[in-house]
Amino acid sequence: MTKPKTVIAMLLSLVLVFAMTACGQKAEPESEAEQQTETGQDTAESSDDYDIGSNLQLAGGGDEKVIDTDHFTITLTHGSSWDCTVDSKTSVTIYNVTAKAANYGGRLVSIKVYNPADKSYEMLPSYSVIGEKNGKMYIAEYPSDVQFDPSDEQAAEDYQAVYEEVSKIREGAADSPIILK
């Protein structure tokens, strides 16, 4: 028997897919900040030698896995179901392994860094401010489309289990899985 949460998650995913399809093509970015966000270019100033993935280490597995860098630590359970990649000097993405392997993206969250004066992150479709530390603004960017195969119940459950933890970043919960250094 299918769990009610799974059914609701799959229905919401389908609604999101239909809504995204109905919206059509995204408008061309108008400002330089929008273009920068669209192209995925580094968000910190290029003269800065900041590297969000500096000394990135992955530890653990099984029930818990930890991403540790010089700038933040993130601890999530369901360690065997997710992994991370350094996208650029200013972005690290955490993704669901199964969904990514099935070509559904699998992105759970991207941790991005901005200079405090750069507010271009406000144009991201879904984000939350993690905080400011050492002269940098840390942003969590969440996917705005379905990142797993909605017809695969197990894949949906695996994705949702870790996404619930990642969502604590958005909520600013006391038990948020991320700590800025």
Residue ranges of each PLM-predicted region?
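Repetitive helical segments and hydrophobic/amphipathic motifs
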Residues: 12-14
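C-terminal motif of bacterial Sec signal peptides marking the signal peptidase cleavage site
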Residues: 18-22
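Mature, Sec-exported extracytoplasmic domains of Gram-positive
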Residues: 26-181
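Bacterial N-terminal signal peptides that target proteins for export
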Residues: 1-10
